[in-house]
């Protein structure tokens, strides 16, 4: 008897992906979940509509969704990308001086002096172009992933502008101020707050957000977040907030089933393979071959069995 695969909540799929991106970006597990919850609590305090809250929630979960696309650039620029990423996260929306100084201290740390000197010369002449390429590839992959997962147009639009800044000095530098989607502005405040909390709790987060208000961050979003005191952080120090993050999803809680589920899983598989260009579409190809084998006349297998094996292969 064939039992069809149960539908999958899109929030669960996005949540699983956010856990993977936490690891890929060198962040503590559930950073993405905490970012989504912090941003959503701010959105609710602002009285945003349910649809707007949905966009904020999924933007928070998937703000690292394009991280595998930048691996090659990160490795070329920094050497040890996994050591560099968490350090760069602490200054991503800081001042230009903070960003450049941290990049110089981090890039190819431990290498011979001549090698580091060559890297610094290259960074001085091509660093900005490299980072623009980095941001564009990350955002393009994130938007495409959101599309293939069946997320709404506003979510996909937000995922295109993850690395823009309030002052217009972000990447790729196309938007500034209120031109940035509100979901992105709230996500950025929440992300910076969570990263700072890892090092010094809400007090350090408040100082960090205050310094960046009006430059890297939306000053109104910072003001509203800080006006809530410690309330946004309530319960986020638990060993795991998975259940709370899933329960927090606003709106009708959409699911993926059948062909939509297959496309969602294929998108997640391609995301994983993008870490290495040599492995691109490997998981998708594996699942296709698995299905072809099961559909061979000699196997006598049903379509349901083939679909199940394809999902397992991904």
Which residue ranges define each predicted feature?
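Histidine- and acidic-residue-rich, metal-dependent catalytic cores
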Residues: 2-314
């Amino acid at each position: 008897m064939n039992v069809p695969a149960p539908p999958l909540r899109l929030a669960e799929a996005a949540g699983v992906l956010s856990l993977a991106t936490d690891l890929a970006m060198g962040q503590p597990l559930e950073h993405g979940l905490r970012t989504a919850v912090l941003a959503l609590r701010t959105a609710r305090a602002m009285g945003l509509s349910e649809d707007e809250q949905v966009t904020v929630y999924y933007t928070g979960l998937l703000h690292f969704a394009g991280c595998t696309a930048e691996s090659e650039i990160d490795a070329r620029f920094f050497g040890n990308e996994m050591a560099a990423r968490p350090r760069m996260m602490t200054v991503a929306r800081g001042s230009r001086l903070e960003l450049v100084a941290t990049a110089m201290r981090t890039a190819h740390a431990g290498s011979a002096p001549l090698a580091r000197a060559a890297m610094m010369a290259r960074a001085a002449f091509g660093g900005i172009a490299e980072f623009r390429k980095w941001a564009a590839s990350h955002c393009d992959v994130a938007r495409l992933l959101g599309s293939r997962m069946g997320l709404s147009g506003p979510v996909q639009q937000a995922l295109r502008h993850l690395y823009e800044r309030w002052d217009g000095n972000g990447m790729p530098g196309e938007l500034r101020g209120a031109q940035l989607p509100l979901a992105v502005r709230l996500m950025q405040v929440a992300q910076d707050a969570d990263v700072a909390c890892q090092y010094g709790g809400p007090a350090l987060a408040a100082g960090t957000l205050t310094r960046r208000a009006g430059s890297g961050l939306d000053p109104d979003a910072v003001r509203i977040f800080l006006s809530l005191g410690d309330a946004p952080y309530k319960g986020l120090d638990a060993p795991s907030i998975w259940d709370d993050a899933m329960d927090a999803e606003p709106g009708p809680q959409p699911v993926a089933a059948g062909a939509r589920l297959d496309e969602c899983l294929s998108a997640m598989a391609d995301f994983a393979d993008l870490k290495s260009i040599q492995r691109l579409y490997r998981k998708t190809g594996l699942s296709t071959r698995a299905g072809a084998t099961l559909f061979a006349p000699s196997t006598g297998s049903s379509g349901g069995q083939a679909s199940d094996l394809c999902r397992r292969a991904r």
